[in-house]
Amino acid sequence: MIVKFHARGKGGGSGPVDYLLGRERNREGATVLQGNPEEVRELIDATPFAKKYTSGVLSFAEKELPPGGREKVMASFERVLMPGLEKNQYSILWVEHQDKGRLELNFVIPNMELQTGKRLQPYYDRADRPRIDAWQTLVNHHYGLHDPNAPENRRTLTLPDNLPETKQALAEGVTRGIDALYHAGEIKGRQDVIQALTEAGLEVVRVTRTSISIADPNGGKNIRLKGAFYEQSFADGRGVREKAERESRIYRENAEQRVQEARRICKRGCDIKRDENQRRYSPVHSLDRGIAGKTPGRGERGDDAAQEGRVKAGREYGHDVTGDSLSPVYREWRDALVSWREDTGEPGRNQEAGRDIAETEREDMGRGVCAGREQEIPCPSVREISGGDSLSGERVGTSEGVTQSDRAGNTFAERLRAAATGLYAAAERMGERLRGIAEDVFAYATGQRDAERAGHAVESAGAALERADRTLEPVIQRELEIREERLIQEREHVLSLERERQPEIQERTLDGPSLGW
């Protein structure tokens, strides 16, 4: 078995998913082992980072593994590749290919940590290659698989995965010719290989310690030939077989020492990577930053052309995320969770989900709904579903049922009751939207729809209602003060009018004749 990571990762999500399963999801010999292809595709499309996904393959020379071996190898690879991360912190798609006569386990990982929205880079070759190579050695030894590092398994030709088909066909044809000349006894060393290439009409443009490069007869970039025939160590053809046998014997004798060293390298690498992941993707730290209004992970790496941390988890559950550069998928999630427009009361896409969650809450009241289920993806906390103080920035409308006139006919009690009714109705609508939407969006992002998350969502909505209720107190207090001030002003105005009318009454009084004649 050999682990390969592809250089691709900057396109949309349809590219890798369509390659693994076919455009119509009908590729022959392809089987989905784990993950949701459409979810992975949409997560990749919603990722704002320059490199959107990481992909690769575990390639086996064998056609099949022992029963349960595939699942164990896949789980072990995830733990070693992303130590310190839980299953609900990343998304991965595993697809099996059998169309080449051997087993291939292909994987695709969106480059986004789901709980913080930060950029996730599962594999960086310079830092992670030693750890992955060590894991490869351990797995091959444990299952007795074909070892590509064994001297007897060295390839006579090694080509990069992204080499065009025409160049690949030319390199393979050249190598077959060299191999035929070698077995015929006409090639005894590397110099004979160079001479044979020249006599065949090919131009040798570069010679290094491990390869020979020839010019492409059709133009374009040179073709690099790398393998046993093209290495500097291929100096004596007569002793190649004896040398290979000797190296193979030494390789087998040192197997236990090699395994111990691989175990040490793998453990140390996992410890370092685990500390880095836990520090970088700490849920508490990330949520605190999100509530404070900062963008998680923004600008943490210079090669991220897009804004980091504005797509999912922590930010999407109720925090303000603005900007026209966001993808349509994320804007849809954001608008569904936190609507900055007035609620019109029209039926929404999540009302049915809200009813389902309410029914689930009644059925499972008092029970731990996650208990007894396979904990592949742990249930999120209430804070993860509701997004913390998601209503702190929401403006609660107060216009519904509030009389606008302040004339004497509208009593203060009626206006106060109307204002309270409007505020409570607006807060209740927000609670209903959260109950219906929080579970729907989380299930859309992670593929899980557990009833416990529904209960958490309801609890969060209840807390939101309590916060909305507390906002009524200053409103009512202010209404009382305004009413009292207006009553005082009206009394003063009446008194002033009465004082102005008294002189006028006195002036109109006339002294008549005395009746005492």
UniProtKB/Swiss-Prot annotation:
- Manner of cofactor binding, per the entry note: Divalent metal cation. Can use Mg(2+), Co(2+) or Ni(2+) with similar efficiencies, but is not active in the presence of Mn(2+).
Q: What is the effect of changing E104A?
A: Loss of in vitro DNA-cleavage activity and in vivo functionality. No effect on DNA binding around the nic site
**Can you list the disulfide-bonded cysteine pairs?**
none
Q: Give GO MF terms, alphabetically.
A: DNA binding; DNA topoisomerase type I (single strand cut, ATP-independent) activity; metal ion binding
UniProt keyword annotation of Magnesium present: yes
- Active site (UniProt): Y19
Asked if the Swiss-Prot or TrEMBL record annotates the protein with the keyword DNA-binding, the reply is: yes
What spans are recorded as compositionally biased (Basic and acidic residues)? 297-310, 496-510
Region Disordered, as annotated, extends over: 281-310, 380-405, 496-517
> Altering H97A: what's the impact?
Loss of in vitro DNA-cleavage activity and in vivo functionality. No effect on DNA binding around the nic site
Name its co-factor(s). Mn(2+); Co(2+); Ni(2+)
Q: Which InterPro entries match?
A: Endonuclease_MobA/VirD2
* Catalysed reactions, as listed in the record: ATP-independent breakage of single-stranded DNA, followed by passage and rejoining
- Under which main EC class is this enzyme filed? isomerase
Q: What EC identifiers does the entry list?
A: 5.6.2.1
Pfam families for the chain: Relaxase (PF03432)
**What residues bind a divalent metal cation, as annotated?**
H97, E104, N106
Which keywords are on file for this protein? Cobalt, Conjugation, DNA-binding, Isomerase, Magnesium, Metal-binding, Mobility protein, Nickel, Plasmid, Topoisomerase
UniProt similarity note: To E.coli MbaA and MbkA.
Reproduce the miscellaneous comment text: The 100 C-terminal amino acids are dispensable for activity.
Report the function annotation for this chain.
Relaxase involved in plasmid ColE1 conjugative mobilization and is thus essential to promote the specific transfer of the plasmid during conjugation. First catalyzes the specific cleavage of one of the DNA strands at oriT, forming a covalent 5'-phosphotyrosine intermediate. The nic site corresponds to 5'-(1469)CTGG/CTTA(1462)-3' in the cleaved strand. The cleaved strand is then transferred through the dedicated type IV secretion apparatus.
Quaternary structure (record):
Interacts with MbeB and MbeC to form the relaxosome.
Question: Which NCBIfam families does this entry report, sorted A to Z?
Answer: relax_MbeA_E1
Q: What is this protein called?
A: DNA relaxase MbeA
According to its UniProt entry, this protein's organism is: Escherichia coli
Gene of origin? Answer: mbeA
